[in-house]
Amino acid sequence: MSKRTYQPSKVRRNRAHGFRKRNATKGGRDVLKRRRAKGRKRLVVSAPKK
């Protein structure tokens, strides 16, 4: 039996899929642009503010 592959970590999730990571590349900025155009409430996955 192999272990589950999803081992959640807020830090790792934000580093991989956060706003700064998206903004760092042309493709990522395109993603943000599309999500803004679509009217997404949340542009990126990120830990909710406390």
From Swiss-Prot:
<feature type="compositionally biased region" description="Basic residues">
    <location>
        <begin position="32"/>
        <end position="50"/>
    </location>
</feature>
<dbReference type="InterPro" id="IPR020939">
    <property type="entry name" value="Ribosomal_bL34_CS"/>
</dbReference>
<dbReference type="GO" id="GO:1990904">
    <property type="term" value="C:ribonucleoprotein complex"/>
</dbReference>
<dbReference type="Pfam" id="PF00468">
    <property type="entry name" value="Ribosomal_L34"/>
</dbReference>
<comment type="similarity">
    <text>Belongs to the bacterial ribosomal protein bL34 family.</text>
</comment>
<feature type="region of interest" description="Disordered">
    <location>
        <begin position="1"/>
        <end position="50"/>
    </location>
</feature>
<feature type="compositionally biased region" description="Basic residues">
    <location>
        <begin position="10"/>
        <end position="24"/>
    </location>
</feature>
<dbReference type="InterPro" id="IPR000271">
    <property type="entry name" value="Ribosomal_bL34"/>
</dbReference>
<dbReference type="GO" id="GO:0003735">
    <property type="term" value="F:structural constituent of ribosome"/>
</dbReference>
<keyword id="KW-0687">Ribonucleoprotein</keyword>
<keyword id="KW-0689">Ribosomal protein</keyword>
<protein>
    <recommendedName>
        <fullName>Large ribosomal subunit protein bL34</fullName>
    </recommendedName>
</protein>
<dbReference type="GO" id="GO:0006412">
    <property type="term" value="P:translation"/>
</dbReference>
<dbReference type="GO" id="GO:0005840">
    <property type="term" value="C:ribosome"/>
</dbReference>
